[in-house]
UniProtKB/Swiss-Prot annotation:
Residues 98-110 are annotated as: Hinge. GO terms for molecular function: antigen binding. This is Ig gamma-1 chain C region secreted form. Keywords: Disulfide bond, Glycoprotein, Immunoglobulin domain, Secreted. The gene is Ighg1. Transmembrane segments: none annotated. Residues 111-217 are annotated as: CH2. The lineage of its organism: Eukaryota, Metazoa, Chordata, Craniata, Vertebrata.
Length: 324
């Protein structure tokens, strides 16, 4: 995918919606590639009450939203600006968020919806492990306390299914609510590229909101896995780092875990998949261990799950050799 700058849209309630002492303003950053973008409010001077949601990848482009809750009086229209920066395209956009005034009292005017809907893919480990259940997740955020319940409908290749598990809505720290629906899916349905659609409806929405997701299209390519022992310069410290480099794989869905003498290890961190110039991806994983455990000759194993691999799994081990 080529570098694409974002489009930025202000999200503001109408004056009729500003009945309490606070008002939530939003900023939708849509259709950019690659990650990341940064969103600040009033060039960073406004940080309290800010909630920026994770980016979602659809059709090879990213979308995210950010909201800020501010006092509704005095009117914030002169002071609230959403600042968006996309370094990859050298794009900087400033959008002033102006609450709409419909000029009619006490009528209710049509306003942009502040609620946002996101759809998330199943975890790669769930898709590639036959004993686990992969799930596609649909999340609605920024639901007002006074809004009616939202209804979820799910479709697989445009055929409605009724097996989703919808949780009661949960109150968030900013006094809005979040509603989540999870659809258990068949492993092969995801791997074969079927399309999953979440339709969200509510009396508070002017129209249903639909989000779709499917596996990234393209021929799977198995990763190459390399393990790297701690550098000599680190051996003077109490803790050392073992590195696993996983490269040249496609699509980006991958699981990387570590074991220590066959038991799950926890003290590791993975990077997000990063695109190579040829369209494949690479990931680094770092496991921190006590130097004494490394020097004792314990075996540390980097375990990788990816659909391009034989049996979807491979692993590489490393251990300290005396005298090295």
């Amino acid at each position: 995918a080529k570098t694409t700058p974002p489009s930025v849209y202000p999200l503001a309630p109408g004056s009729a919606a500003q009945t309490n002492s606070m008002v939530t303003l939003g900023c939708l950053v849509k259709g950019y590639f690659p990650e990341p973008v940064t969103v600040t409010w009033n060039s960073g001077s406004l940080s309290s009450g800010v909630h920026t949601f994770p980016a979602v990848l659809q059709s090879d482009l990213y979308t995210l939203s950010s909201s800020v809750t501010v006092p509704s009086s005095p009117r914030p229209s002169e002071t609230v600006t959403c600042n968006v920066a996309h370094p990859a395209s050298s794009t900087k956009v400033d959008k002033k968020i102006v609450p709409r005034d419909c000029g009619c009292k006490p009528c209710i005017c049509t306003v942009p919806e502040v609620s946002s809907v996101f759809i998330f893919p199943p975890k790669p480990k769930d898709v590639l492990t036959i004993t686990l259940t992969p799930k596609v997740t649909c999340v609605v955020v920024d639901i007002s306390k006074d809004d009616p319940e939202v209804q979820f409908s799910w479709f697989v290749d445009d055929v409605e299914v009724h097996t989703a598990q919808t949780q009661p809505r949960e109150e968030q720290f900013n006094s809005t609510f979040r509603s989540v629906s999870e659809l258990p899916i068949m492993h092969q349905d995801w791997l074969n590229g079927k399309e999953f659609k979440c339709r969200v409806n509510s009396a508070a929405f002017p129209a249903p909101i639909e989000k779709t997701i499917s596996k990234t299209k393209g021929r799977p390519k198995a990763p190459q896995v390399y393990t790297i022992p701690p550098p000599k310069e680190q051996m003077a410290k109490d803790k050392v780092s073992l590195t696993c480099m996983i490269t040249d794989f496609f699509p980006e869905d991958i699981t990387v875990e570590w074991q220590w003498n066959g038991q799950p290890a926890e003290n590791y961190k993975n990077t997000q998949p990063i695109m190579n110039t040829n369209g494949s991806y690479f990931v680094y994983s770092k496991l921190n261990v006590q130097k004494s455990n490394w020097e004792a000759g314990n075996t540390f194993t980097c375990s990788v799950l990816h659909e391009g691999l034989h049996n979807h799994h491979t692993e590489k081990s490393l251990s300290h050799s005396p005298g090295k």
